[in-house]
Amino acid sequence: MALLGKAAVAMWWSVRPEQRSEFGDWHSHEHFPERMSIPGFRRGSRWTSTTDAEGFFVLYELEHYDVLTSKGYLDRLNAPTPWSTKMMPHHLGMIRSQCRIVASFGGGVATSLATIRLSPEAGRETALQARLSEVLDALARQPGLSGAHLLLTDTPRMSAPTTEQQIRGKDGAADWIVLLSGYDADVVERAVIAQLASSVLHAAGAQNRMTVGRYRLAFTMTPQDVAAI
């Protein structure tokens, strides 16, 4: 998939099995429509982990970086609905990264996704970003793959945690994020093992600590979908 806009919110968390049914109902029928009604939100997608029975990944694609500090978004973060207030404590181990999209290749929405969380070695940021852009551009063109992207976390300065953050507890954040999507899960996996392996990225300038997640698409929504409801 090609990411829509210039910024994103990327989130990883877990939900216990006994909460997953209500979580899916709330997230699909209330929370996503609410978020897609905020000016500047272009698309939301929810992904279910294929390796962790409790894991989720959610991506919000935003028109531009300033949406992260817009009144429309902050008003929602500080006034959660009763259902959101009930569900937020069940977001366990939240990693929430507010990002700039620095490279995005491909098109469409596919069913398989790999996420790689990494950090650059000090002084090698420029070289690593350039190398990743080359690799991701090439990967997005390969049969079985559909999109390849690089996001850099750039957390806006906020005076205080939002109400939603206070309900959840302290969120973590990733640093650099690679997203690789495809319509063939085996091809996505082979690319992660070969072109995006820890040893390959370390040689290009990444630190040797990376976290890889593997997901399948569960739900996606755009503002146009909300308008049609």
Roles of regions detected by a PLM:
Residues M1-I229:
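Macromolecular interaction modules
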